[in-house]
Amino acid sequence: NTLNGNNYGVILNGIEAYGNLVTGNTINDSNYGIRIYNDAHDNNLFSNTIQDSANFDIQLGESEDTISFNNTFSTISVDSNANMWVKVYLDLTVYDNSSNAFSNADIEVKENSSVLYSTDYFGGSDDRTDVNGTIETFMVAISHYNGSSEPDDVTTNVSVRFVDWIISGTYNVSNSLSFSVPDFRVQNQNNGNMFYSIGGAISASSPSNG
């Protein structure tokens, strides 16, 4: 849809305005491109272009947990009792050092302290990486307008583990993350077990290993 020259391009008003998906619109020359207020909540703005608004491209009054994905806008007003999450789809891939897909790796993804994805090693029930070295794609927040027209950054914490090798870090996600599991192996000569780190081999050794 293309909406031109309106007072409001899109308006979501009241507590019954929830769970809506506003997507694929071009909104030009409005006073307010999109306005959400008066206890509207849990609405989704996907792939809209809002431009040349007289006041604000997006105006959030009293409203909770609006989600923004792939929207183009330049001006926003967020009241003290409103918030909006800006999100992207996270594509996570695990490789070996030869750039081959690495399957069966454990993954944990946290948004700040909230767990979004967790395999059994990390206490969850989500799937490990598949034959393509990937997990299912899902949304993570990259910024949060929380009672302010200036967003706060949201960090994504990711841990990847295979056998005794593990890496954990904090990332500012754009849309994809990739991790490389080292190719080298360390063998415990006493029992023949292979390890992905020297530390793992040492930890599993006994005094009789010499």
Kindly label every feature range from the protein language model.
Residues 90-96:
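A short, amphipathic beta-strand motif
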